[in-house]
Amino acid sequence: MIKNIILLAIIFVLVDAGFIFLIRNTYQNMIQKIQGSSLKMKLVPTIACYVILISSLYYFIIHKKGSYLDAFLLGLFIYGVYSTTNMAIFKDWPLKVGLIDLTWGGFLFLITTYLFVNLTKKQI
C-alpha cells in the first residue's frame, strides 16, 4: 500500500508540475495583480495540499476501485471548490483562470489514475 501511495504521489506531482510550468506566466501575472507582489510558494502548506489531494485520489478512486470518470469528477469537484472560492473572495480572480483550474483538476486526477493503473497493472 505504501509503495502504491508513493508511486501515485510521484505521478501526481510530476503531472501537476508539468502543467504549472506551462501556465506559470498566467498565474504569475494574475497573482502580481491581486496581491501586488510575485508568487511565493510556502513549503508546508504546499506539501499539506498535495497530501490531501493525493490521499483523496487514493482513497476514493484507487482503493475503492473507482472508474476513470469517477477520477475525473473527483478532481473537477475538488478543484471546482478551489476555483469558485477564489472567484468569490478575490475581485480580480479571472473567470478564465477559474475555468482552467476547474478543468485541470479533472484532467489531473484522470491522467494520474490512468498512468498509475497502467504502471501497476491494477484494476479499477
Model-assigned labels for residue ranges:
Residues 1-124:
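Juxtamembrane/disordered regions of integral membrane proteins
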